[in-house]
Design a protein with these regions (language model features):
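Extreme N-terminal starter segment of soluble prokaryotic enzymes
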Residues: 1-4, 178
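Structural alpha-helical scaffold elements that stabilize or flank donor/cofactor-binding regions
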Residues: 35-36, 65, 173
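Structural motif
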Residues: 43-45
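Cysteine-nucleophile active-site neighborhood
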Residues: 48-118
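Amide-donor transfer/coupling interface in amidating biosynthetic enzymes
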Residues: 68, 101-205
């Protein structure tokens, strides 16, 4: 399988590279349009600031390339947010695959810390991306418990395939056509995250 990772100014790219290597896949790290288009699947990680990321992508027309990819794409963390329509972070227009805007967490009490950092559960699972898991509301041992670090979130919408509750319920995962996303870091979520990445690769076969 030819797995490509979008190369740009994002902070968690190499942890995704290492996650794939642990699964026996040597990914191609690239910002070349033709190489992304020819891959069997594309991973679009991100950790950092949305405006700077979009400026980098637009300068290389990678926003258009990503938007028009036909193979399975997995957006991770800021990668999920950049696939949305607009982000409050830097007040920037994003790639626009998902017709929803990214919002900043607004603490409601002293216990609410931003960024949201740590482990949390996934609810309302609705996709093959979560094959083999049961939603946390079912109280199952197989409910996904995954690692998050983020100050901005995607509201619940028609594309939501998993939800998480921190300050309010929000979309921790999205799906539309060939695009899948995780707000959390599967590459930092142990065996649970590895299984989610494996499910994505299986979708890509």
């Amino acid at each position: 399988m030819k797995a490509a990772i979008v190369k740009y100014n994002a902070g968690n790219i190499y942890s995704v590279v290492n996650a794939l290597r642990r699964m026996g896949i040597e990914p191609l790290l690239t910002d070349v349009a033709e190489e992304l288009q020819q891959a069997d699947c594309v991973l679009f990680p991100g950790q950092g600031e949305a405006r700077g990321a979009m400026e980098y992508l637009k300068a290389r027309r990678l926003d258009e390339v990503i938007r028009n990819l036909k193979q399975p794409v997995l957006g991770i963390c800021v990668g999920q947010q950049l696939l949305c329509r607009h982000s409050e972070e830097g007040d920037v227009d994003c790639i626009g695959v998902f017709d929803v805007d990214v919002k900043r967490f607004r603490p409601q009490c002293h216990e609410d810390k931003v960024p949201a950092m740590g482990w949390n559960s996934l609810y309302d699972l609705k996709s093959q991306l979560y094959k083999g898991f049961q939603s946390a509301e079912d109280g199952a041992e197989s409910a996904p418990y995954v690692y998050f670090v983020h100050s901005y979130y995607v509201p619940l919408c028609e594309h939501t395939i998993a939800t998480t509750d921190y300050i309010l319920p929000y979309s921790s995962s999205l799906h539309k056509d060939n695009f899948y996303t995780c707000q959390f870091h599967p590459e930092k979520s142990g065996m649970t995250g590895q299984k989610i990445i494996s499910n994505f690769l299986e979708i890509s076969m």
